[in-house]
């Protein structure tokens, strides 16, 4: 019986060793799987965080843009008033009363221009060369003093808010 007992103990020891090896292999596999899952979750987190930051930046940019151009329609409507004030200032005056009225209109025009400028409305600077982004060609004329494509005459001033044109400068262009 002692041999049988010895054999059983050896078998039990072998089984115990095999079981420990299997447990260690299982632990390694589980550890590897968990490590892999952790890496995947880290990657997902980083991507989600980057996407969130991009959305946040885009929303901020859209907010700033909306604020910058919120008054665009209103400012565009006021340009007709500006044109009328400029026309009134350009009228020839003969008598003292007309000169005083013209002076008052000029003061009003100056104040009006300052308020428009304060809110980002700016006159489009006169350019010699026709630029379709800033100008609207009303007609083409023959001109000995201008090269083809040059602005000959400004018919109506143009304005912009920041980098957006709210009314192009209306011009005649040399052929």
Curated annotation (Swiss-Prot):
Residues 1-35 are annotated as: Disordered. Keywords: Chaperone, Cytoplasm, Stress response. GO terms for biological process: protein folding. GO terms for molecular function: adenyl-nucleotide exchange factor activity; protein homodimerization activity; protein-folding chaperone binding; unfolded protein binding. It comes from the Bacteria. Homodimer. Belongs to the GrpE family. This is Protein GrpE. The gene is grpE.
């Amino acid at each position: 019986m002692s041999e049988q007992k010895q054999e059983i103990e050896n078998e039990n020891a072998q089984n115990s060793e095999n079981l420990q090896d299997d447990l260690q292999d299982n632990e390694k596999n589980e550890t590897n799987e968990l490590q892999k899952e952790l890496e995947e979750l880290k990657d997902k987190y980083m991507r989600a965080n980057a996407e969130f930051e991009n959305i946040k930046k885009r929303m901020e940019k859209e907010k700033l843009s909306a604020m910058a151009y919120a008054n665009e329609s209103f400012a565009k409507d006021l340009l007709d008033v500006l044109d009328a004030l400029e026309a009134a200032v350009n009228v020839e005056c003969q008598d003292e009363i007309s000169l005083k009225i013209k002076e008052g209109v000029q003061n009003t025009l100056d104040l009006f221009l300052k308020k428009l400028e304060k809110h980002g409305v700016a006159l489009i600077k006169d350019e010699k060369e026709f630029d379709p982004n800033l100008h609207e060609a009303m007609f083409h004329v023959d001109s000995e003093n201008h090269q083809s494509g040059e602005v000959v005459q400004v018919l109506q001033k143009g304005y912009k808010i920041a980098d957006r044109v709210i009314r192009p400068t209306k011009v005649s262009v040399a052929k």
